[in-house]
């Protein structure tokens, strides 16, 4: 059984990777937040500790999953952000190359400036803020220096349910749970959702076929924050009882002050060309996510 070291796997993405790979691989999963029985402590920003822990496990693959993802935190704490999102990725490259094993790194649609209608795998990133720049610097270092790598760009993440999902869907679900009957939703942000379960499964397929390289990896379909909210209310049967108030991004400018691209829509061109696109339509994925993780949440 092949072995995988999963660094920074205590978050929503790590949950799905653990579930998808645990039956077929011997796993060591680490994080600074040890929030599950299958996790042990490791701070991947500490190169020597990270290196020693990985080498002791002697894996066949290194998955570097963790990052700061709050844009506001990143803007306010640039050094901590670059240490976590960029320098730690360089650490992962050094370790993977030393062991001559493939490295998986997770990038983001947020590295683009949003000026184009749709971004494929070969479009040139233009990051707008500290978070986006830190992630792009990590992506670029992997591509330029890792011996073998898989870099997968995610879109608007959803997954892992109310305990670990800190993103858009959970924020909406929390408002509904609190009894909100009117939701203020921006009408000027476009993107593509990414279900963490599908994402982990698609990574597994690429690794099995040794299709190394850089890939956009988002759910099918192009959408917006507004349409995602409308679909969520439809799934929950609340479209007639909860009102959507359309606002532009300036409405939330005090709370969400970090620069965000107006459009983060990705297309999985390389996955399609390699016949490796296993990402489902975002509406199908959203319906499954709500059914599997939020069955009794609003009761």
Model-derived regions, located:
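NAD(P)-dependent short-chain dehydrogenase/reductase
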Residues: 140-191, 197-198
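Mid/C-terminal beta-alpha module of Rossmann-like enzyme folds, strongest
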Residues: 202-203, 209-256, 297-298
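Amphipathic terminal alpha-helices
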Residues: 281-299
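NAD(P)H-binding glycine-rich loop region in Rossmannoid oxidoreductase-like domains
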Residues: 44-84
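NAD(P)-cofactor binding segment of oxidoreductase domains
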Residues: 76-104
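Catalytic helix-loop patch of NAD(P)-dependent Rossmann-fold dehydrogenases
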Residues: 83, 87-88, 111-152, 156-158, ...
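N-terminal Rossmann NAD(P)H-binding glycine-rich loop of SDR-like oxidoreductase domains
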Residues: 3-23
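Rossmann-fold cofactor-recognition segment
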Residues: 32-46
């Amino acid at each position: 059984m092949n072995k995988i070291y999963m660094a920074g796997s205590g978050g929503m993405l790590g949950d799905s990777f653990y579930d998808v790979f645990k039956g077929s691989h011997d796993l060591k999963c680490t994080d600074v937040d040890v929030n599950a029985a299958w996790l042990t402590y490791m701070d991947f920003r500490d190169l020597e500790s990270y290196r020693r822990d990985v080498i002791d496990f002697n894996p066949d693959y290194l998955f570097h999953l963790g990052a700061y993802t709050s844009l506001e935190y990143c803007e306010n704490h640039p050094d901590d952000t670059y240490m976590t999102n960029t320098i730690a990725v360089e650490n992962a490259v050094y370790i993977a190359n030393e062991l001559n094993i493939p490295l998986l790194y997770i990038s983001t649609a947020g590295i683009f400036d949003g000026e184009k209608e749709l971004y494929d795998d070969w479009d040139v990133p233009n990051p707008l803020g500290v978070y986006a720049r830190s992630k792009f610097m990590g992506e670029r270092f992997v591509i330029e220096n890792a011996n073998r790598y898989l870099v997968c760009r995610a879109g608007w993440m959803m997954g892992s349910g109310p305990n670990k999902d800190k993103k858009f869907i959970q924020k909406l679900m929390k408002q509904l749970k609190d009894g909100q009957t009117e939701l203020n939703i921006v009408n000027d942000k476009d993107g593509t959702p990414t279900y963490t379960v599908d994402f982990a499964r698609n990574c597994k397929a690429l690794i099995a076929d040794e299709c190394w390289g850089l890939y956009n990896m988002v759910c099918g379909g192009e959408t917006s924050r507004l349409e995602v909210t409308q679909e969520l209310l439809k799934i929950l049967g609340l479209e007639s009882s909860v009102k959507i108030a359309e606002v532009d991004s300036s409405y939330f400018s005090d709370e969400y002050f970090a620069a965000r691209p107006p459009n983060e829509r990705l297309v999985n061109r390389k996955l399609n060309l390699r016949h490796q696109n296993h990402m489902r339509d975002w509406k199908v994925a959203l319906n499954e996510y709500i059914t599997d993780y939020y069955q009794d949440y609003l009761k």
